[in-house]
Amino acid sequence: MGQTVTTPLSLTLEHWGDVQRIASNQSVEVKKRRRVTFCPAEWPTFDVGWPQDGTFNLDIILQVKSKVFSPGPHGHPDQVPYIVTWEAIAYEPPSWVKPFVSPKLSLSPTAPILPSGPSTQPPPRSALYPALTPSIKPRPSKPQVLSDNGGPLIDLLTEDPPPYGEQGPSSPDGDGDREEATYTSEIPAPSPMVSRLRGKRDPPAADSTTSRAFPLRLGGNGQLQYWPFSSSDLYNWKNNNPSFSEDPGKLTALIESVLTTHQPTWDDCQQLLGTLLTGEEKQRVLLEARKAVRGNDGRPTQLPNEVNSAFPLERPDWDYTTPEGRNHLVLYRQLLLAGLQNAGRSPTNLAKVKGITQGPNESPSAFLERLKEAYRRYTPYDPEDHGQETSVSMSFIWQSAPDIGRKLERLEDLKSKTLRDLVREAEKIFNKRETPEEREERFRRETEENEERRRAEDEQREKERDRRRQREMSKLLATVVTGQRQDRQGGERKRPQLDKDQCAYCKEKGHWAKDCPKKPRGPRGPRPQTSLLTLDDQGGQGQEPPPEPRITLKVGGQPVTFLVDTGAQHSVLTQNPGPLSDRSAWVQGATGGKRYRWTTDRKVHLATGKVTHSFLHVPDCPYPLLGRDLLTKLKAQIHFKGSGAQIVGPMGQPLQVLTLNIEDEYRLHEISTEPDVSPGSTWLSDFPQAWAETGGMGLAVRQAPLIIPLKATSTPVSIKQYPMSQEAKLGIKPHIQRLLDQGILVPCQSPWNTPLLPVKKPGTNDYRPVQGLREVNKRVEDIHPTVPNPYNLLSGLPTSHRWYTVLDLKDAFFCLRLHPTSQPLFASEWRDPGMGISGQLTWTRLPQGFKNSPTLFDEALHRGLADFRIQHPDLILLQYVDDLLLAATSELDCQQGTRALLKTLGNLGYRASAKKAQICQKQVKYLGYLLREGQRWLTEARKETVMGQPTPKTPRQLREFLGTAGFCRLWIPRFAEMAAPLYPLTKTGTLFNWGPDQQKAYHEIKQALLTAPALGLPDLTKPFELFVDEKQGYAKGVLTQKLGPWRRPVAYLSKKLDPVAAGWPPCLRMVAAIAVLTKDAGKLTMGQPLVILAPHAVEALVKQPPDRWLSNARMTHYQAMLLDTDRVQFGPVVALNPATLLPLPEEGAPHDCLEILAETHGTEPDLTDQPIPDADHTWYTDGSSFLQEGQRKAGAAVTTETEVIWARALPAGTSAQRAELIALTQALKMAEGKRLNVYTDSRYAFATAHIHGEIYKRRGLLTSEGREIKNKSEILALLKALFLPKRLSIIHCLGHQKGDSAEARGNRLADQAAREAAIKTPPDTSTLLIEDSTPYTPAYFHYTETDLKKLRELGATYNQSKGYWVFQGKPVMPDQFVFELLDSLHRLTHLGYQKMKALLDRGESPYYMLNRDKTLQYVADSCTVCAQVNASKAKIGAGVRVRGHRPGTHWEIDFTEVKPGLYGYKYLLVFVDTFSGWVEAFPTKHETAKIVTKKLLEEIFPRFGMPQVLGTDNGPAFVSQVSQSVAKLLGIDWKLHCAYRPQSSGQVERMNRTIKETLTKLTLATGTRDWVLLLPLALYRARNTPGPHGLTPYEILYGAPPPLVNFHDPEMSKFTNSPSLQAHLQALQAVQREVWKPLAAAYQDQLDQPVIPHPFRVGDTVWVRRHQTKNLEPRWKGPYTVLLTTPTALKVDGISAWIHAAHVKAATTPPIRPSWRVQRSQNPLKIRLTRGAP
């Protein structure tokens, strides 16, 4: 009784005073409350063996210390004082601790050495692998365990295990099992009390501390014995722990404990790894362990000998009986443990963490544990770390159950809530949840209330609507009837006027209506309803009206429901019917008259046919009215019966109009046929599993679930659900419910999410759900599409099979299952409280909208039907995704094949639609075609789809039209030629200009569709014939097959030729047309023989093509395609009918293609390649281009045999082909009007002049790809120069000849002259520029009066014969021409004044430019583009800053960023007194206005008084409303300096640099990285550094240097007495008189000194620098007008802030160069205008 247990924690708390004294000696401070928190709660979580009651074991204390001192976010700096104090107590225990401390030495962190026998001293032991060794001296026994006064039990404080009994001597040859059995049997199991007391009473045995469970054991004779692992231990470890890949941390902890407690050998470690790890995991662990091997320098090494020595992969020869062998083993275990830890680090996968959500019935605490475990497994973050508490808290809120998460998000002050608070709140919410019965009852009650309320609202709304309609209809019909009567009576009929004494009720005189005796008395009864059809002017009572007669008609393609009104003269539409006509009618109603407009003519579908009618558009009418005008056209008959009005047609049949969807509108134009599979049909009863109507939703049971692979770099995408209207949500709700009931949609939780898009079906109010899978499609791997091409799918259908069956599979994609791993990809959000759904839904089947769905389904169905095709080889089965066509030769075969196909589909799990089935018919519709008797037609539906499209207004609408019409192009001859005007408008960036040509082409295509012929199906057993024609670059043809004596068209083909082929002569264009159409026809012929018939004999052209027109590549392509005699043959030349492209009965005029092609000439008819006998000149031209010193140089020359006529260097980079063209062109220009023979060795120049130039010109100077050809300007110049000589012969000669002929000598001289010109003569850029452009002819020069005055001053002469002035031997160019030329040159180059001047000086201009330099400077300065980009060279002089007149009145403030220090300080707020230079700096964690005002009010104001002026930059903390409001309230003038001008805050900016430099030096000198600790020393230096006037800020402020003490001075007594207070005051007064006033005067003198102002004035135009420019963005913006100026800054129009003068530059406003001048005249009312220039 009364006994208590003494623990280390309780012991320290009882002696807390001594603990605080020890902590003070360690320079730390501890508190009892926090020590109680850390010891039992924090330190046990470090997993180092710390007990909750504490321990004095130094090994455990050191391990806890290492955890506390860990760098980075996992450290615990707040626990440092407590663990340091605890360590000091353990190292030097006070008297009250010594009795409870074990005398054993603390474990050393070095590698352990197992002793081979008893030793004199205990060896050092590792904290990780403790090896228990006997102590030299036994512990003294305690005489008393239980104290008489109820003292604590002391035995619990020891760290040693209970002592074992004495071990008997063991025989040397005895085995270990028998020894251990003997040992165990000799020692009975003691009770806890006995073992506790025995340790205090009996001394321990010599080897009592040696473990008996290790594989390496110390025997009784001091020898180590080996005990391997038992199979039961390995089995238990394997089965009771998770795998390494599943939970590496837990398995690593197990192996660590095994290595610590069992001391396994190398073989045991391999056995342990092989049992607990897989082969791949083991290899990864061994690899990481070898990476952790360290060399002699302590760093990881990669030397093989050192790695193999420390961590061998093969069995080492270690001797465990020696200390060296045991040290090797200990190191191996340590490396192995490091490898386990490194290999167990899994990469960060936050998606896995996000996937952890709270279960429906899971408690919040259990969910939190799962969430923390996910953080440990999938991230490197520790969820217990305080720094990660925010992330864990947010995950806990977001991933909780929806009801808990929503309420947690609404908590007040959520940021201050800890994780423990959130769990507590979540538990409250979880415990207050309603039971499923209560929730179901609440849902039922709410549903009933909602339905009841909705029903009442609907009834009330319906009553109000009927009442309003009756009232408005009464007014309208009364107005109509009144108008009709007035029309019949010839005018307006007014009510007769009453006399003064006449009754308005009975019309008798003598009384009024209120006193009329005939008027009924009593309460007024309910007013009877008025019949709409019996209204009259006065109104009257009628019988109960019959049901409203209504009828639905189709107006303009839209169904409209009308109210039949025989009294209405005209039919009325209420809604906007589209365009309205200009006609209008005046409608007089009961409430007044109003004018309404008529609609344009609308097509109305009546029972008697389609008519055109115009309606009266009355938006105020409550219902559309069917008046007598349409009833007459309808020939309707109205019969009134007791049951109501009945409307019938002219033949007595009821009038009914079908209302249907827009996409099914085309079915109205088709011949109606009865469905082949009716509800009572035998096809349904015989094959119930094959039809969707009887078999339900299909499921392909033989197809494995599909796995959708993602791209390697794909990450989950989550797109929130778009807002959805209530109408749309209710519209798709039934579809969602149906898919949920069928299991196609299931609830899920997925990181993927894509929105649901409700799409309204046209013409109805029904919606269908469509999922936007665009982002998912981007992240899924692409597969090659194998869906058949409908263009040639029917080519495999032989004409002999004329019995068809068409099946359309219902919900085909939903028949294929999705693998569970791929289902989360297609998740979408859906909320329906009525169904109890609030979350995500995903597809279990293949969804629609997925890009690979058609291909996957097509392949799956094709594989499933493979056996059917093998078993029925006589049948033809065509498949296009989910559309099947079965063809047979007879009706019986078709029926049998259809039965087999339906049975196969049912067995496979697919379902066909009975409504759309076409079984065993000779005419069916398939893929938009009508198939019958081996032919195919365009269905009327396809034609109506194209015909119903309106005229395109945008490129997108035009592309839609061409796409729809292009599907039918096989039926339209010359389709490419018709659509040629339309295709240019579809290009991006082209202006959509719809003109007459486009309208004509649009109507021609529609007209061609209406007359589309029937095309025969391709018969692959017969040869094909292709008739080809070409016209104006368009290839046209028809593919036919023989049917008896006739040719039946199979397809009409047309295509536009490429630009190269379009420029050829007609015969060659025919070759290109045949090649293009033969390639397209191959898609239908499937490689069958093809006979080509054309009006040209092109076979000879293909066999021997002219090399001057065709390139080798194109020639090879044509020959390989057209000379394949096994497949392509040429028929006789035929003349084709341009309408049908079929041969004419009469033969056309024959011609020889080769002969015509040979007669085709180039540009110049007289041009030849043979020398002219009587030529005036024979010249040789050559161009040269070569590399010299890394630069390509070029030149051109024209020579005779012996002399050089012309040679010129060309710009660098000029190609040899261009140089040849320039040389040849120059020769032709110099031979103008003469006979010339010119030789060139360039095949390119020769072919361009003779052949290719004309070809280029014909095809618009474009390549085959449609791009512009190279050397375009040179080719055009050459073609133009060909007409200059009188007679011309361009002759090709071989280059680099060595003979002595005239041709060889001339060619060598031309080549040599061109090379020398390229090397010696600099390129004449200006001359080339002028030659390439249109030259300025002196005959067009016009000189102004100013030009003439200048010319006379220069001494220029006037050339009378040529009409221009000459100066320095050159024609003088007038000033206006000079301006235009230089302005054009500058716009091309945008060079500056100096560069353009140098360029013009270097060139040899043929003209003298008047006022060139002045004009050049003007052009360069007035260029707006250069002004926005070029840098400014203007320099602004330094200004003078305003300073305070005394300390504390004027401060400059700034934030500067410093690298993060301790406790999160990363900013420094600096205050500088501008008068004295005194600096105050405060470390801060944030850069906010709150901190600025706080430091100003708490630090600056109490010490220095209230500032008068504050100067800062435009930072957010200074311009915020908080800072400015505080300054305004305190009367502080807050001056904001110019942006991006640090000189404006120069004093504080310079101080920022000084403080940072000082802190850098101090950190390097002291070795610490805590700059906050060193900040006072930096401020001390800044405050005691002399300023510009030789005084330090401290001296200016206090009048003397700071007191310094020399502690080595022998006379320290003189520092003990300080001056009196009066002396201090006198000194400060002297400072104020001798220092402050002169200093203030000096500052004032600086302000009074004149400062050179900037040159800008109010009204000037300036460019403003853009300080943050993006890529390819000009550096200047503007120009702006200057509004205000200061000596250093400006305010411009359009920018609110002041701008420093250094950030602007003057904008040169180009003055208008007038072409007219104004002069005064003698008459004051007249002025004189003269042409001129300034």
From Swiss-Prot:
The RT polymerase active site binds 2 magnesium ions. Its EC number is 3.4.23.-, 2.7.7.49, 2.7.7.7, 3.1.26.4. Residues 560-630 form the Peptidase A2 domain. Mg(2+) 2 binds at residues 1182, 1220, 1241, 1311. A zinc finger (CCHC-type) spans 501-518. Residues 112-217, 433-498, 512-551 are annotated as: Disordered. Residues 344-392 are annotated as: Interaction with host PIAS4. SUPFAM superfamilies: Acid proteases, DNA/RNA polymerases, Retroviral matrix proteins, Retrovirus capsid protein, N-terminal core domain, Retrovirus zinc finger-like domains, Ribonuclease H-like. Mg(2+) 1 binds at residues 808, 882-883. Mg(2+) 3 binds at residues 1454, 1513. A motif (PTAP/PSAP motif) lies at residues 109-112. A zinc finger (HHCC-type) spans 1386-1426. It catalyses: DNA(n) + a 2'-deoxyribonucleoside 5'-triphosphate = DNA(n+1) + diphosphate; Endonucleolytic cleavage to 5'-phosphomonoester. PROSITE patterns: ASP_PROT_RETROV, ASP_PROTEASE, INTEGRASE, RNASE_H_1, RT_POL, ZF_CCHC. Belongs to the retroviral Pol polyprotein family. This is Gag-Pol polyprotein.
